[in-house]
């Protein structure tokens, strides 16, 4: 195994406890238009980890929400979310100390399905932005989780291979994206998992945990040839590919 060089963290449910906040904000936005609320069980099993617009598209298909109200609900939900985040998300000294120490050894990035405004507010509340190399919100990608684009973009930005990178995720959709990226994955049960000693233990036992979780990381020590392809690759980009054209899998 190559030496680990990069760490990528999801935001919601990993660094901040926001599942209930997003649940309440969405239901408050729906109820303001006299639309039936969703249960917390459904939110966890179906909607958790998805951008708001994709949650609404599911409600559209279920005939719970008329599509014409989507834009209104998105605006209301985001406004309520920011209000709740400002009220309930607090500085976490354990997270701060963890990122302070980790940043001395690894590149750190954040990859979330949250909007940029939510991402920036949470990083400000946690006071960890200075330890992060860069961050991506759902506004920075064409395809959100469970598509792996956000993680592939992180790899390109960091200049790292999947075998050099560990992802921390919690939601079903996020885990799917992380697995499809080919990176190492640690599934977070709760925010208390994110502490320096635990993360070092995870890294030190990475090989064993990968085998236990049966996550396949692609590698081939014999492959060392890169064959460039002509053209700018605009058709590939429009089709949703993230990596530069010469690096697209065939």
Specify the residue positions occupied by each region the protein language model found.
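Asp-based, Mg2+/Mn2+-dependent phosphohydrolase catalytic module
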Residues: 1-3, 116, 121-214
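Substrate-recognition element of Asp-dependent hydrolases with the DxDx(T/V) motif
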Residues: 95-124, 178
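Conserved hydrophobic helix-helix packing surfaces used for dimerization/oligomerization
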Residues: 7, 165, 223-225
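N-terminal glycine-rich phosphate-binding loop and ensuing alpha1 helix
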Residues: 218-250
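Conserved SAM-binding loop
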Residues: 15, 45, 108-111, 143, ...
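N-terminal helical cap/lid subdomain that shapes the substrate entry/recognition surface
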Residues: 2-96, 104
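Short, flexible loop segments at the rims of nucleotide/cofactor-binding pockets, characterized by
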Residues: 84-90, 113, 248-250
């Amino acid at each position: 195994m190559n030496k680990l060089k990069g760490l990528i963290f999801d935001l919601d449910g990993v660094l901040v406890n926001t599942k209930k906040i997003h649940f309440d904000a969405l239901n408050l936005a729906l109820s303001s238009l006299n639309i039936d609320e969703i249960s917390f069980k459904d939110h966890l099993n179906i909607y958790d980890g998805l951008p708001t617009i994709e949650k609404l598209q599911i409600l559209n298909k279920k005939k719970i929400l008329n599509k014409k109200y989507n834009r209104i609900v998105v605006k209301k939900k985001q406004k309520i979310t920011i209000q709740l985040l400002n009220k309930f998300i607090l500085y976490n000294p354990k997270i701060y100390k963890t990122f302070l120490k980790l940043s001395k050894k690894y590149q750190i990035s954040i990859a979330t399905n949250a909007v940029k405004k939510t991402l920036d507010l949470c990083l400000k509340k946690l006071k960890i932005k200075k330890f992060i190399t860069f961050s991506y919100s759902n506004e920075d990608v064409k395809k959100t989780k469970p598509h792996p684009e956000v993680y592939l973009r992180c790899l390109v930005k960091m200049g790292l291979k999947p075998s050099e990178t560990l992802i921390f995720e919690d939601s079903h959709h996020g885990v799917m994206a992380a697995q499809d990226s080919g990176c190492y994955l640690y599934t977070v049960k709760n925010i208390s998992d994110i502490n320096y000693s635990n993360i070092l233990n995870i890294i030190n036992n990475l090989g064993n945990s990968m085998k236990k979780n049966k996550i396949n990381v692609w590698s081939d020590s014999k492959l060392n040839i890169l064959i460039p392809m002509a053209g700018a690759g605009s058709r590939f980009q429009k089709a949703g590919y993230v990596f530069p054209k010469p690096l697209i899998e065939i």
